[in-house]
């Protein structure tokens, strides 16, 4: 088996550097090549064996995503489906409309939601579902909490000359919405939970919603904007990371029925689900394959093989190749059955 690793040139924290480190230090028996797979000529020139495998880190940075959309079908065909992210992972990545369709098709609990094309459609949906403002609005494309806002009703007033009194009416603040968008029931919670399946490990992270007391422009996490120079240089999300907290063993045990439920719905090498609520009334907000070491705050994980909760020691949590290592272990298991 030979591995072909995408040279993700758009990001200073390039994945291929981390993979190269792993190959040189830990997986010396694996033959590999680093290739910029954004270009069709590079893909066409590859001499692929029957068991060769492709690993791509395609992010949601606009230029990267547009190039990736063009070449992914070619890569999938070239490697006969032996590619990470797989076809299903890629289909739902960065596309909240498709994720909503997945929820509806598979009866996954989620907030009342709708893909809205305009004002009339928006108003009709709010009234039909007897929803109260605010309403959550999400761009149909975008990862995580980017492009997510709360929409309120604005109060308008005018003076009635005939009756000589001031009158008022409320109307949706349309300026906040860029149609078409996902519109969603607002559920007031203090935090959400990221449940991340990485190979056979399940990690949990509580992320606090602080928009009410901190930065109200950043719903729901309330963190400050990143310096523009840093954001542009490293192709980062616009806001700082939310305040996070690891779950203790009791909290994890309570979530295991949800873990098994989600695993049955979508079983893949690396995927993260954002949920709110508990086992009695949990709802899924969105999901996506994971390519970032975003779970460094986790202190433990659930082992899907042994059905045990295990400690994740400090060095492991900070290991900069954690996700890359788990992906390689999973691919070796698929290829060699060990």
Language model region names:
Residues 136, 276-277:
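Conserved protein-kinase catalytic-loop segment immediately C-terminal to the catalytic Asp
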Residues 4-6, 90-181, 252-253:
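Active-site nucleotide/adenylate-binding loops and adjacent lid/helix of ATP-dependent enzymes
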